[in-house]
Amino acid sequence: MAPAASRLRVESELGSLPKRALAQYLLLLKLYPVLTKAVSSGILSALGNLLAQTIEKKQRKDSRLLEVSGLLRYLVYGLFVTGPLSHYLYLFMEYSVPPEVPWASVKRLLLDRLFFAPTFLLLFFFVMNLLEGKNVSVFVAKMRSGFWPALQMNWRMWTPLQFININYVPLQFRVLFANMAALFWYAYLASLGK
């Protein structure tokens, strides 16, 4: 009888692990909102790059090791750009277009899609170019060839997600929601950079 009781206790403790992790995340989010969002954004951005590299390796049947510098670039971008900037942009959007304003959901979506999306994409290309140590001519060439297709893909993929995010996801979870979706978005952007 003791082994069964012991097994049940272990199983119940394992079930509480996600609850404890969530409680810890919520506490950190409350105490250090920008830092928590920055760290989670950095980690999820690096995971998105890892996903892109893994997909690319399988498509090319490549046996090379993963490019650690790519993971680090995405980590830095998420940690210092996406996480903190997203935190403040969602706050700005929440307070500049409060939910009770007529057509708030449409106004927020238009603000996000027509202003924030192109700005973030431009910033992405610029920061990645800097982190890769490339010159301005490479940046300009990449903008000419990749910006418009990437923005069109952004509008297709992110518009429904951002409508849900900015209108239905609680403010403190919007960066995390976007970061989870961005796993696949960064995989797409990383594939453009190759």
Swiss-Prot record:
Annotated function: Seems to be involved in pore-forming activity and may contribute to the unspecific permeability of the peroxisomal membrane.
Membrane topology: Multi-pass membrane protein
Membrane topology (Peroxisomal): 52-74, 135-172
Subcellular location: Peroxisome membrane
Species the sequence originates in: Mus musculus (Mouse)
Transmembrane segments: 31-51, 75-95, 114-134, 173-193
Family from the record: Belongs to the peroxisomal membrane protein PXMP2/4 family.
Protein name listed in UniProt: Peroxisomal membrane protein 2
The entry's keywords: Membrane, Peroxisome, Transmembrane, Transmembrane helix
Pfam (any one): Mpv17_PMP22
Domain of life of the organism encoding this protein: Eukaryota
GO cellular component: mitochondrion; peroxisomal membrane
Lineage, highest ranks first: Eukaryota, Metazoa, Chordata, Craniata, Vertebrata
InterPro entries linked: Mpv17_PMP22
Quaternary assembly: Interacts with PEX19 and SIVA1.
Residue spans, topological domain Cytoplasmic: 1-30, 96-113
